A protein has these predicted regions:
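Short, well-ordered beta-strand elements
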Residues: 1, 33, 43-46, 65-68, ...
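N-terminal lobe/hinge region of extracytoplasmic solute-binding protein
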Residues: 1-40, 70, 161-164
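A structural "hinge/loop" feature
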Residues: 1-8, 31, 58, 126-137, ...
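Gly/Pro-rich hinge or "lid" segments in bacterial periplasmic/extracellular proteins
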Residues: 21-22, 113, 119-197, 205-207, ...
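Aromatic- and charge-enriched surface segment that lines or borders ligand/interaction sites
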Residues: 33-84, 116-118, 209-212, 259
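Surface-exposed binding/hinge segments that line
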Residues: 47, 64-66, 73, 77-145
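Extracellular/periplasmic solute-recognition and catalytic clefts
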Residues: 171-182, 199-257, 267-268, 276, ...
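Append "and occasionally in soluble cytosolic enzymes with long acidic Gly/Pro-rich linkers
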Residues: 182-183, 261-331
Length: 331
């Protein structure tokens, strides 16, 4: 699982130790109702909510997190986000096969309701990481009933099989048509869940989704066609709400490539991109040009890097690398 749409779906059905605060600020308690951090910032003790249940009635325990994190770090699973847990002592070594005993990894169950996590180094943002779906627990018995710990195609995620611990349960999954989730009456905070059902539609075309929203076929959409956004902003469309989105869109460069491993070549590519023109002439919906991976304003962070559009410098760097006027540069 990877991507923003999948994230929205998963947070409706699953819950980790903490929950992202929708109003910003520190994460809120999830399965963990409280936690303690050691003075050196390396040891966390989480106290789990005794009312936290799986959708089949089983209690969510500390051991569920231990097993689930072991699953994510199992190399043969091929998880997309094992590095989210690399902050744990021994996690990276286990995932890379350098150690084989998971008891050497910094997560353990003190008892059913206390989870101990040991980090390699102090990590001030660790609590925030715990709202990411890669750290969510999965129901061990259900996973193993329908496959193995590293089975990527097990049927444990199918309707009727899936056991979750979040506000919603999986009701239906019709491929390329819709996914329906319904209120989970066993969720520990069910009284505050206002929706009885959510239907997710896999609309691949932005214009189609926009028309569906304007026709009343969708209650919510976070997609606005590029050509429509400036019009909606200019006309002050009451249905348009723009909120800060902490996301960064970027090109990923293979630094092992014979050409791209040259730092000057990579700098040339960076100086050749007119970020300001992209957000002003292409996306046109209030985006900010990205000059750093971490968005400005993240927990008070302000980037001190700047890679302005400079085609002359880009050409010079390419020439110095043996690609004058771009000749010989692989495309």
């Amino acid at each position: 699982v990877t991507g923003v749409p999948e994230h929205h779906l998963l947070i409706s059905m699953c819950e980790g130790l903490t929950i992202a605060n929708p109003r910003g600020g520190d994460n809120l308690p999830g399965v963990a109702e409280s936690w303690e951090i050691s003075e050196d910032g390396r040891t966390y003790t989480f106290y789990l909510n005794k009312n936290a249940l799986w959708s089949n009635g089983d209690q969510v325990t500390a051991q569920d997190f231990v097993w689930s994190w072991m699953r994510i770090l199992t190399p043969s699973l091929g998880s997309q986000y094992p590095d989210m847990l690399y902050y744990l002592k021994g996690a990276e070594e286990f995932h890379q096969g350098k150690i084989s005993n998971f008891s050497d990894v910094g997560v353990s169950a003190i008892n059913d309701h206390e989870l101990k996590v040991e980090l390699k180094n102090p990590t001030p943002f660790f609590i925030r990481l715990l709202s990411h779906y890669s750290t969510y627990p999965v129901h061990k018995e259900t996973v193993l009933k329908h496959g193995t710990i590293d089975d990527r195609n097990g049927k444990w995620t199918r309707p009727g099989n899936f056991v979750c611990n979040g506000p919603m349960n999986l009701k239906a999954w019709e491929l390329n048509k819709q996914i329906i989730v319904e209120k989970n009456p066993l969720y520990w905070d069910a009284d505050r869940v206002r929706l009885n059902e959510i239907r997710y539609y896999p609309v691949s075309n932005e214009s189609t989704e926009d028309r569906m929203f304007r026709a009343g076929q969708l209650h919510v959409t976070n997609v606005v066609p590029l050509e429509k956004c400036p019009i909606y902003i200019e006309n002050e469309n009451p249905n348009l709400r723009i909120e800060p989105y902490m996301g960064t869109y970027f090109y990923r460069i293979n630094t092992l490539h014979p050409v791209l491993k040259n730092k000057d070549v990579r700098l040339a590519l960076a100086f050749a991109i007119n970020r300001k023109q992209i957000v002003e002439k292409v996306s046109k919906c209030g985006q900010a040009a990205a000059y750093s991976f971490t968005p400005p304003g993240s927990a008070g962070y302000e980037p001190d890097t700047d890679v302005p559009f400079n085609p002359e410098l880009a050409r010079s760097l390419l020439a110095d690398s043996g690609y004058a006027n771009g000749e010989g540069f692989p495309v």
